[in-house]
């Protein structure tokens, strides 16, 4: 009965759901600037009868329905990366275009595409009485520049609530995902001595010192591709140099400092301490005093001025296939569309790195679209999936209550 009623409501609101997505994609939300898009989402939640709608101290938008003992969070980050050169898009990156039932726009799949389904789905669940003994939160947050910082503040600061379960709306191709690799961001700095390039031999070129490290980083990544750190579900770890910078007096001077930045992807087969020790082990003994490894921290203020310093270590996580949350997700899919679907994991990182990785809160992922299109100038999401996702988000709380009575 609930399934059919949900489907009726979703189909009746198909146009509203699609229009809502188009409108929030058309509002740029770069660099964590969420106020305008948050206001638009908040207005929709108010219209649909959410019990509480407000911004938190960081500037994320919150919507609550119910006040039961079981607390569920639907997590959808609503900030986006930039668009690069707009001329490479062929259409307005934010207003986008709809072609063959697909919306092409920045944020369409990463990750504004899950927001309409979550917001409408929860409102339908409320109308149909499917949230008995449940408090359900929609959490539209900033994530692109520091995975997990928003949920960390959600638990520890505002609203200061530790949920029992989390559903992450990152794209999963309408399958159930339950984890991903972790990562750590590191900075390696080599110091030298400046000199005029005409007499460079009087200096000590910091770039040359780093060359051996860069070569070893590339070799380390190659060894990982051959099985080092492999995990049977999460796959292979990796490492890459992602940025460099030099400090030099001028273009005709020897640099006295050279810095590289590393992105190290981590599986559950590895530990944080092992990974850091591994990187430090790349430094030759004779350069131990001249090359230093530093773990990065994020301490930039949000658009509201809120500062929440965190390490840029993002743990890997994986929820067991037999966990009641996983089973509730699979049962929801089966009830709605017949048959369970293959479980998966993301290649990229999500807010699950805090929810599940740091806080140990059971989490799963379900969302429309394919992550392969994230951060590209072909970013896209099938509108049929955006609409159908609302069915999942509406029914899921009821199916979860049957798994964790």
Where are these regions (language model features)?
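Acidic/His- and Gly-rich active-site-bordering loop/insert found
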Residues: 2-104, 127-132, 370
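Metal-dependent amide/peptide-bond hydrolase catalytic core
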Residues: 3-5, 187-405
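Residue-level signal for inorganic ion chemistry
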Residues: 24, 28, 170, 210, ...
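Buried hydrophobic packing segments
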Residues: 41, 115-125, 151-154, 210-213, ...
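A structural signal for isolated positions on well-ordered beta-strands in alpha/beta enzyme cores
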Residues: 54, 73, 137-139, 292
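Short, flexible, mixed-charge acidic loops at enzyme active sites
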Residues: 84-96, 181-185, 304-309
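A short glycine/serine-rich beta->alpha loop
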Residues: 100-109, 195-197, 342
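Acidic/histidine-rich catalytic neighborhood of metal-dependent amide-processing enzymes
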Residues: 111-181, 185, 401, 405
């Amino acid at each position: 009965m609930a399934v059919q009623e949900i489907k009726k409501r979703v189909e009746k609101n198909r146009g509203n759901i699609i229009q809502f997505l188009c409108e929030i994609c058309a509002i740029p939300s770069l660099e964590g600037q969420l106020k305008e898009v948050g206001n638009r989402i908040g207005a929709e939640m108010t219209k649909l009868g959410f019990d509480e709608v407000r911004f938190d101290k960081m500037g994320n938008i919150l919507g609550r329905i119910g006040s039961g003992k079981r607390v569920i969070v639907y997590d959808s980050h609503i900030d986006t990366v930039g668009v690069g050169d707009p001329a490479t898009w062929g259409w307005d990156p934010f207003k986008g275009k709809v072609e063959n039932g697909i919306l092409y726009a920045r944020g369409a799949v990463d990750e504004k595409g899950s927001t309409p389904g979550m917001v409408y789905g929860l409102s339908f669940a409320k109308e149909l009485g499917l949230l008995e003994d449940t408090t359900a939160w929609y959490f539209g947050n900033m994530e692109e520049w520091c995975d997990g910082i928003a949920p960390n503040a959600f638990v520890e600061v505002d609203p200061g609530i530790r949920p029992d379960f989390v559903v992450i709306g990152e794209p999963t191709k309408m399958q159930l995902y339950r984890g991903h690799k972790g990562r750590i961001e590191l900075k390696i700095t080599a110091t030298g001595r400046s000199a005029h390039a005409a007499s460079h031999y009087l200096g000590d070129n910091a770039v040359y010192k780093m060359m051996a490290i860069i070569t070893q980083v590339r070799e380390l990544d190659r060894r990982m591709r051959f099985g080092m750190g492999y995990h049977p579900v999460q796959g292979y770890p990796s490492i890459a140099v992602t940025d460099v910078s030099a400090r030099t007096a001028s273009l005709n001077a020897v640099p006295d400092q050279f810095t590289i930045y590393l992105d190290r992807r981590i599986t559950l087969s590895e530990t944080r301490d092992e990974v850091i020790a591994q990187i430090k082990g790349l430094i030759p003994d004779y350069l131990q005093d001249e090359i230093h490894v530093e773990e990065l921290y994020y301490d930039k203020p949000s658009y509201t001025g809120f500062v929440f310093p965190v390490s840029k270590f993002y743990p890997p996580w994986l929820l067991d296939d037999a966990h009641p949350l996983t089973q509730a997700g699979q049962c929801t899919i089966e009830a709605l569309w017949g048959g369970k679907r293959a479980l998966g994991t993301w290649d990229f990182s999500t807010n699950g790195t805090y929810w599940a990785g740091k806080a140990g809160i059971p989490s799963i992922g379900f969302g429309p679209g394919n992550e392969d299109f994230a951060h590209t100038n072909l970013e896209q999401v099938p509108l049929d999936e955006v609409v159908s996702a609302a069915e999942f988000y509406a029914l899921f709380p009821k199916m979860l209550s049957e798994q964790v009575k």
